[in-house]
A protein has these predicted regions:
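Short acidic, glycine/serine/threonine-rich loops at helix termini
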Residues: 42, 82-86, 139-143, 166-172, ...
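Electropositive, gly/pro-rich neighborhoods at or near active sites that engage anionic ligands
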Residues: 1-93, 179, 184-193
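Gly-rich Lys/Arg/Thr-decorated short loops/hinges at beta-loop-alpha junctions or inter-strand turns
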Residues: 87-102, 197-202, 237-239
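C-terminal functional extensions of proteins
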Residues: 179-334
């Protein structure tokens, strides 16, 4: 016989009872008032807050748990439904049997990912990019900019570094003082990223810098021109940080979650910190592709619970041009 979930009232803000239930990132249902209710806002390592009157259940971060809330305890009346894993070769995201390998065929992976991106866009789905500064360092700014322009990016999540080096590249053609086009160092180039931070402060924001006409290219230029939202989360090592960077970690988490809401696919580009953070904020039903030159970065993402992620061991500067080309080819034939 099915047992209704057990729950108890929170006695103090942010404090859970000893036997609270901790969620996975898989779709979860609770048996409440003799019927199954789907838990909304599914994420791993969260509490489940229920409303027995409205018959609702939602994942909640510890910081959002308040006195008087009803929280699920124990394991009675809880059903977890892991997503099905298709047999090898049947699904675009089942490239090879291992999740992360340096020996996967990049060309075929790119082709399958491109087909998925075109399909999601056609169905008015949501594609989110999580990006690190290596996008700029490796010369892939123009490729990501084109993807934004073509409507294949519906939100960008990053840190201070991607913005600063993107603006440095737009202003001076360098990234960390290295001429991106020729791969050579430049005179006094070590100060270039600080020049970028200074220009951002001078303008007051990315939006104002774009409006001023000082930059006319780049990832965040395209975001502003194409109304693509972005959230930049600060860290202790940031230069600046730039005016648009959110330095309150809790607020940054909230804004990341807003962008990730209803995402169909998340592409993670060379940023271990932000990729793992995002992995913790999405359900296992969201497709994830992580591209990084370092195999251990992708392995860490998988080890921390984002088991649905497919790891592509590649330099983003090599992978993004191939992906963009594949998207253009597929778009022409449809």
């Amino acid at each position: 016989e099915l047992q209704n979930i057990q729950y108890t009232k929170i006695k103090k803000n942010f404090v859970l009872p000893e036997n609270f239930y901790s969620t996975t990132n898989n779709p979860t249902f609770v048996y409440l008032n003799n019927k199954w209710i789907e838990v909304k806002n599914q994420m791993m390592d969260k509490a489940i807050i229920i409303d027995p009157i409205k018959n609702t259940a939602v994942c909640s971060m510890l910081r959002n748990v308040n006195k008087g809330d009803f929280v699920v305890v124990g394991e009675e009346g809880i059903k977890i439904v892991p997503p099905e894993r298709p047999r090898e070769g049947l699904d675009s995201f089942q490239f090879m049997s291992s999740h992360t390998s340096t020996e996967k065929p990049i060309q075929s992976i790119s082709s399958k990912l491109a087909r998925d991106l075109v399909s999601i866009k056609k169905n008015k789905g949501k594609i989110i990019v999580v990006g690190g500064p290596a996008i700029v360092h490796t010369g892939a700014v123009d490729d990501l900019s084109q993807l934004i322009r073509l409507g294949f990016v519906h939100g960008i999540l990053a840190g201070n570094a991607l913005l600063v080096h993107d603006v440095e590249h737009a202003l001076l053609g360098t990234s960390l003082g290295i001429d991106v086009k020729h791969g050579s160092s430049t005179h006094m180039g070590h100060r270039n990223h600080i020049v970028a931070v200074n220009e951002l402060f001078k303008a007051g924001s990315v939006k104002k810098l774009v409006k001023s006409g000082k930059i006319n290219s780049g990832i965040f230029y395209e975001c502003e021109k194409n109304n693509v939202p972005y959230v930049l989360a600060g860290s202790i090592r940031d230069d600046g940080p730039a005016p648009d960077v959110i330095t309150d970690v809790v607020e940054a988490q909230k804004q990341y979650q807003k962008i990730l809401s209803n995402a169909d696919l998340v592409i993670m580009l060379s940023t271990m910190l932000h990729s793992i953070a995002v992995g913790n904020m999405i359900p296992s039903t969201v497709k994830v592709v992580a591209i990084d030159i370092n195999p251990s970065s992708v392995t860490k993402l998988l080890d921390r619970g984002t088991g649905q992620a497919i790891g592509v061991v590649s330099d983003v500067g090599s992978f993004l041009p191939i992906l963009l080309n594949d998207i253009k080819k597929i778009s022409k034939t449809r």
